[in-house]
Amino acid sequence: MRLLALGGTKFLGRAIVEAALARGHELTLFNRGETNAELFPDVEKLRGDRTSDLSALEGRSWDAVIDVAGYVPAVVRRSAELLRDSGRYVFVSSISVYANFDEPWDESGPTADLGDAPVDELAKDYSNYGPLKALCEAEVEGVFGDRALIVRPGLIVGPHDPTGRFTYWPHRLARGGEILAPAPPERLAQFVDVRDLAEWMVDAIARELSGVFNATSEGIPWGELLDGANVTWVPDEFLQEHEVGEWMELPLWIAGTGLRVDVGRIVAERLRTRPLAETLAGAAGAPDVEGVGLTPEREAELLSLWHARSA
């Protein structure tokens, strides 16, 4: 197949290109050439900026277009309209499109709505990420119809992760000592290895799948994630009382059931997830990110407060 990747050199895009090349597909990358430009030297590279200059794509079509970073609806619409003669359009959205996580929604769950708010203004930062992604989905479906494949990942983890949101845990395990973690250990954490997601997406394109898919694992108990470590489990109420930041200060943690979704559809369509140890090893090579994760001092303070309360 002939595939066009919008981006394709950072995290998920990079993994998709690697998976596609491993399967013998022909790739073209369209990006600004500013991130990891040295990657994939034998792949055709078109330079431009999807917000202002799509001229390198004019008059061309591919078997599938893969859009990993669309966020502004008008920008996504322009690329979809220009590439409408391509076979299908694969848009990477997010489970953040759901209006709430009161239950683990399947793909028909309620999505967030911006109402009458001015989209252009709201797109200037990431505080409206979910609703804007939902609008981007609609733009793609409006142009490509049943040739659109909408992928809604949860937290993506693994090699080359630039966010630090999962990387904190393999790094923390490697450091050893007493580890603070959110109780109960039976609570599930949902995430997907970037390599598993990329391989599924490339295979889904080859199989001409369409429609919407929640794209994450069925879930791993926290106790399994931290198996073998010296863990002190503390309840949500304690973490909230001491203003521990969800998701970023204590990665993966959101009070209650967290960001869980129903993944029955993608599992039925052959999403394969590798062993946890392999995912942890892959993530361990990614760098820490400043401001993500508990500092050793903050963790020690919280552990001391917890033990004093429990004495």
Where are these regions (language model features)?
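Conserved beta-loop-beta element that borders a ligand/cofactor-binding pocket
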Residues: 136-160
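Mid/C-terminal beta-alpha module of Rossmann-like enzyme folds, strongest
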Residues: 200-256, 282-284, 289-311
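N-terminal Rossmann NAD(P)H-binding glycine-rich loop of SDR-like oxidoreductase domains
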Residues: 3-23
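Glycine-rich Rossmann NAD(P)(H)-binding loop
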Residues: 6-7, 158, 182-187, 213-220, ...
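NAD(P)H-binding glycine-rich loop region in Rossmannoid oxidoreductase-like domains
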Residues: 9, 34-87, 91, 97-99
